[in-house]
């Protein structure tokens, strides 16, 4: 059992004719398992790859309400400040979960709200009832102004 743990792979020496052939062709050795285990040090960037001055989009102001270049720069600065305020990711690479911030009742009703099908049908029924009551009262008013055959009978 202990001999299994001591097994290792020894790469044999490359034959001379293969070494000469690779040298003539200019063959470059691919990554090995050991080189893949080493993580390269990437330069740290803010993630703003297109923020170089010559790569920024052109700002065109067509109307009075359009954003100007200065306003765009202010907004970008605010976004960067907001990112800086956030907690940096932990060094050990673990994902941290936080509870969501509770909203006030005003904010709950101001946005889109989901409701159940029962509530929707109840609300629709109430609206339909109100509409039918209005229509019935209008029909009664219209009925009184419609032609009547009783008047003709009385005239004869």
Swiss-Prot record:
Compositionally biased region (Basic and acidic residues): 121-134
Chain intervals with Acidic residues compositional bias: 43-56
Residues the record lists as Phosphoserine modifications: 50, 148
Region (Disordered): 22-64, 81-156
Matches recorded under InterPro entries: DUF4604, KIAA1143-like
Domain of life where this protein originates: Eukaryota
Modified residues (N6-acetyllysine): 108
Keyword field: Acetylation, Phosphoprotein
Keyword Nucleotide-binding: no
One Pfam family it belongs to: DUF4604
PANTHER family the UniProt entry points to: GEO02494P1 (PTHR31195:SF2)
Protein name stated in the entry: Uncharacterized protein KIAA1143 homolog
Species the sequence originates in: Bos taurus (Bovine)
């Amino acid at each position: 059992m202990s001999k299994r743990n001591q097994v290792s792979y020894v790469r044999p020496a490359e034959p001379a004719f293969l070494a000469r052939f690779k040298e003539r062709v200019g063959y470059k050795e691919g990554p090995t398992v050991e080189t893949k285990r080493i993580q390269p040090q990437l330069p740290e960037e803010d993630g703003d790859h297109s923020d170089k001055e010559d790569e920024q989009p052109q700002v065109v102001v067509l109307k009075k309400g359009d954003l100007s270049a200065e306003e765009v720069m202010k907004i970008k600065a605010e976004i960067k400040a907001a990112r800086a305020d956030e907690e940096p990711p932990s060094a050990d690479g673990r994902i941290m979960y936080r509870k969501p911030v509770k909203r006030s009742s005003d904010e709950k009703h101001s946005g889109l709200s989901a409701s159940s099908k029962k509530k929707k049908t109840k609300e629709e029924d109430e609206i339909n009832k109100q509409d039918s009551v209005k229509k019935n009262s209008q029909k009664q008013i219209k009925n009184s102004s419609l032609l009547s055959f009783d008047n003709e009978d009385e005239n004869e």
